[in-house]
Regions:
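Catalytic cores of TIM-barrel enzymes
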Residues: 1-165
């Protein structure tokens, strides 16, 4: 783990802010509304979420203060729900924990997904199959892998950074 003291301080500050927001009356009310919604009880209103993933590059960089690449990736993950909650006031819940990512790999039919960037906001998936009969030999078994060591390393890093918060 190569995170500077300044970046560590920033991540700890975000962890404290996340805890504060997660235990706020508004977040607790939202949790109850989501539970009612999920149980198919009549919600008082529609639940609204803004999916920040599609435009986070326009919002999050201005909020980021970490300088190291590894720290910036963690900071970005922490900022997503905080930004939804504070900037857009949508119905996104702020979690009371830092979730370690799933360290999974999936290769459908044994063919790695190929993406071609367009230079703009979109991308194109490059197909392997053009004629199913002719290209059937390309299809193999799908591959699923779990990187337990990677997940454990990320968990240890998170515990080291803000496990006491």
């Amino acid at each position: 783990m190569n995170i500077s003291q300044e970046d560590r301080a920033r991540l700890r500050e975000l962890a404290r802010q996340q805890q504060e927001l997660a235990h706020s009356p508004r977040n607790e009310r939202l949790m109850q509304e989501w539970i009612a919604y999920g149980a198919s009880r009549q919600p008082a209103r529609p639940m609204i979420r803004i999916e920040i993933d599609t435009f986070e590059q326009d919002v999050l960089p201005a909020l980021q203060r970490c300088t190291g690449e590894e720290a910036r990736a963690i900071e970005r993950r922490m900022l997503r729900p905080i930004a939804n909650f504070t900037l857009f006031a949508d119905d996104t819940l702020v979690p009371d924990h830092y979730a370690v990512r799933e360290h999974l790999q999936f290769v459908p039919f044994g063919l790695p997904v190929r993406r071609q960037e367009t230079g703009g906001v979109g991308h194109h998936f490059v197909p392997y199959l053009h004629d199913l009969e002719e290209d059937m030999h390309l299809l193999g078994p799908s591959v699923y892998r779990v990187d337990e060591a990677g997940a454990q390393a990320e968990q240890a890093q998170a515990e080291d950074l803000f496990g006491d918060i």
